[in-house]
Amino acid sequence: MSNSAKSVVILAAGKGTRMYSDLPKVLHLLAGKPMVQHVIDTAMALGAKNVHLVYGHGGDLIEQTLSDQTLNWVLQAEQLGTGHAMQQAAPHFAGDEDILILYGDVPLIGADTLERLLAVKPEGGIGLLTAILDNPTGYGRIVRENGEVTGIIEQKDATEEQRKINEINTGILVANGSDLKRWLSQLDNNNVQGEYYLTDVIALAYKEGRKIEAVHPTRLSEMEGVNNRLQLSALERIYQSEQAEQLLLAGVMLLDPARFDLRGTLIHGRDVVIDTNVIIEGNVTLGNNVQIGTGCVLKNCIIGDDSIISPYTIVEDSEMETGCTVGPFARLRPGSKLAEKAHVGNFVEMKKSYLGKGSKAGHLTYLGDADIGRDVNIGAGTITCNYDGANKFKTIIGDNVFVGSDTQLVAPVIVAKGATIGAGTTVTKNIAENELVVSRTKQTHIQGWKRPVKEKK
């Protein structure tokens, strides 16, 4: 942001009636985070010293959702138009700073476009973001005389001739704070809507002989607002398409870019292959030669080089070292870590557990609060019984242990290295090195047994 432009105002007080939702409009998610958060992030990327958020409808929930943000909260108790919203923010302006005005429901506005807008703002004048549309219906029109911007006329107030203008107002502008205060104080609501229009400051500035410079966005999607769920879904697709394009150009192989969702940040190595319907959330790192199967969900995780995640696997807040294989239909819950070449197979769930180098849990297993050494085999149907209804307890399994199928390990329990646990065993006591442990009921054979037969009705 330029030296003089140090504050941003984000207008986010609208009700969002056409969303048909109890959730404030600006909190609806785009790419996994609230629309308004995208705008806040862009403001911060510009280096804004102050971000004033004008809020109203659903204010408590908005404050709660954004409680970790460094914002100046400005209440607009009544929604009487964009001009009225800015009047609430005006007392917070420093006289010598420029004010950039953004909107909480215009989430895709880019920092590069705003940098150009800030650069063209004339001294004492206004920098205005406009766009040329084939169909400008619904937008305020830019009125010019001899090529100079003289005002903005809203659709409902425009004449038939003015409605033919195809240069439209995006609502985004930058002006000096002291000038804005003066112009805002002169607004009236003498219009069809009975509202105070921020756009009227353009005509007021022109009357004072101030220059208004207009620039266009780099992409039209940057100025598109959201009034309903259809528009939100359209922007979601635009955003995802842009993310997919960037990944493809960076060397990630998306087998179908139209069926990939990035809802966070993806750091990747070389020769990564991602199949269809994969969702990336939070901060995810994929090493070299990683393969992600169809239908996987990865959230806040690190996947080491040469690892393969098979279809329909969920990995959250977990880490894999080099050469791991996981899935299909596996779930790694928060706190799971796989060492080099560890294997977690189908219908295996891990939580707060470590699986050592070369160890395997092939199928139908729950490993919770477990620390498992290297080269361990976990048989099908094994369960670490880690919860007594009040507290969680740890299971520790040493290197080279063989755990037979259908084993229950009742924590807290320690299985020393080299031990063997027979199938169907319930382990309730610690096991020493190289011991064989079996606990089963005696198998009984009853000759001539006849099954019960239902009586005929």
From Swiss-Prot:
> What is one GO biological process annotated to this record?
regulation of cell shape
Where would you find this protein in the cell? Cytoplasm
Gene3D superfamilies for the chain: Hexapeptide repeat proteins, Spore Coat Polysaccharide Biosynthesis Protein SpsA, Chain A
Task: Name the cofactor(s) required for activity, per the record.
Answer: Mg(2+)
Q: Which GO terms describe its molecular function?
A: glucosamine-1-phosphate N-acetyltransferase activity; magnesium ion binding; UDP-N-acetylglucosamine diphosphorylase activity
- Choose one Gene Ontology CC annotation of this protein and give it: cytoplasm
Q: Which residues bind Mg(2+)?
A: 105, 227
What keywords is this UniProt entry annotated with?
Acyltransferase, Cell shape, Cell wall biogenesis/degradation, Cytoplasm, Magnesium, Metal-binding, Multifunctional enzyme, Nucleotidyltransferase, Peptidoglycan synthesis, Repeat, Transferase
- The segments labelled N-acetyltransferase in the record are 251-457
Which Pfam families does the entry mention?
A: Hexapep, NTP_transf_3
Q: Pathway involvement? A: Nucleotide-sugar biosynthesis; UDP-N-acetyl-alpha-D-glucosamine biosynthesis; N-acetyl-alpha-D-glucosamine 1-phosphate from alpha-D-glucosamine 6-phosphate (route II): step 2/2; Nucleotide-sugar biosynthesis; UDP-N-acetyl-alpha-D-glucosamine biosynthesis; UDP-N-acetyl-alpha-D-glucosamine from N-acetyl-alpha-D-glucosamine 1-phosphate: step 1/1; Bacterial outer membrane biogenesis; LPS lipid A biosynthesis
* CC cofactor note: Binds 1 Mg(2+) ion per subunit.
The active site of this protein is located at 363
Q: What is its EC number?
A: 2.7.7.23, 2.3.1.157
- According to the UniProt record, where is the region Linker? 230-250
Question: What residue spans carry the region label Pyrophosphorylase?
Answer: 1-229
Looking up InterPro entries in the UniProt record yields:
Bifunctional_GlmU (IPR005882), GlmU-like (IPR050065), GlmU_C_LbH (IPR038009), Hexapep (IPR001451), Hexapep_transf_CS (IPR018357), MobA-like_NTP_Trfase (IPR025877), Nucleotide-diphossugar_trans (IPR029044), Trimer_LpxA-like_sf (IPR011004)
Outline the subunit composition. Answer: Homotrimer.
Per the record, the similarity remark reads:
In the N-terminal section; belongs to the N-acetylglucosamine-1-phosphate uridyltransferase family. In the C-terminal section; belongs to the transferase hexapeptide repeat family.
Q: What is this protein identified as?
A: Bifunctional protein GlmU
The organism's taxonomy opens as: Bacteria, Pseudomonadati, Pseudomonadota, Gammaproteobacteria, Enterobacterales
